[in-house]
């Protein structure tokens, strides 16, 4: 609260009240409220190594900047989840992710870009970098965080507003104009919504 910012945290294994373990992302708003979004679709390796259970609810989180949606890693690969968030008014999707190799990263990246195009929204991907030797299923990481846009006039060339170097701790900043999304949805080259 003292810094007057909203924080979209990454996700991590969290023990639920009934004893299950879920992968949960937390959102801390500047008004002091805390929101949680469960990962709906755990990966096979999450199920195998950590016995992660999938959540069953996804919805927008109301912020003072408008509604946002959280798609944790693999959830970005399921178009129906993103469409539900877009139908609820989300114009920005946040995708915290943890991939161990370039192939896994590219799946999340390509699907996140598709979600930006399909739903005419912004997608902010933020991934883990560094290695954790001795921690099962977390020993290596591959990430290249980015801020993605629809592919149309008024937006960044190639649908990429900002992109980090691979496997480097860094901060990315981009100005995202939500009125450009309104324009795209009403006047754009394609109108998906």
Regions picked out by a protein language model, each given a short descriptive name:
Residues 1-8, 77-169:
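CN hydrolase (nitrilase-like) catalytic-core segments centered on the catalytic cysteine
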Residues 11, 72, 127:
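A cross-domain feature marking catalytic cores of carbohydrate-active enzymes
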Residues 14-88, 101-114, 190:
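Active-site catalytic loop in hydrolytic enzyme cores
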Residues 23-27, 59-60, 125, 144-147, ...:
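Short beta-strand scaffold segments in enzyme catalytic cores
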Residues 29, 149, 178-180:
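Non-catalytic surface loops within mature trypsin-like serine protease
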Residues 32-35, 153-155, 181-182:
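Short helix-loop capping/hinge motifs at secondary-structure junctions, enriched
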Residues 39-52, 169-183:
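A short, polar/charged loop-to-alpha-helix boundary motif
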Residues 185-193:
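Flexible mid-to-C-terminal extensions adjoining Fe-S/redox cofactors in radical SAM and related proteins
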């Amino acid at each position: 609260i003292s810094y007057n910012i909203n924080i979209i945290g990454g996700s991590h294994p969290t023990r639920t009240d009934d004893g299950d373990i879920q992968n949960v992302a937390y959102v801390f708003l500047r008004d002091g409220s805390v929101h949680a979004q469960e990962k709906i679709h755990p990966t096979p390796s999450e199920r195998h190594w950590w016995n992660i259970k999938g959540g069953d609810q996804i919805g927008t989180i109301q912020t003072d900047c408008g509604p946002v949606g959280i798609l944790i890693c693999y959830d970005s690969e399921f178009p129906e989840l993103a469409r539900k968030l877009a139908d609820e008014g989300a114009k920005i999707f946040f995708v915290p992710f943890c991939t161990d190799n370039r192939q896994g990263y590219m799946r999340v990246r390509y699907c996140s870009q598709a979600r930006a195009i399909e739903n005419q929204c912004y997608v902010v991907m933020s991934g883990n970098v560094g290695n954790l030797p001795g921690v099962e299923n977390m020993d290596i990481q591959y990430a290249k965080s980015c801020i993605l846009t629809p592919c149309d006039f008024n937006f960044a060339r190639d649908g990429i507003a900002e992109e980090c170097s691979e496997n480097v701790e860094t901060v990315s900043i981009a100005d995202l104009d939500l009125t450009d999304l309104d324009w795209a949805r009403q006047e754009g080259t394609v109108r998906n919504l």
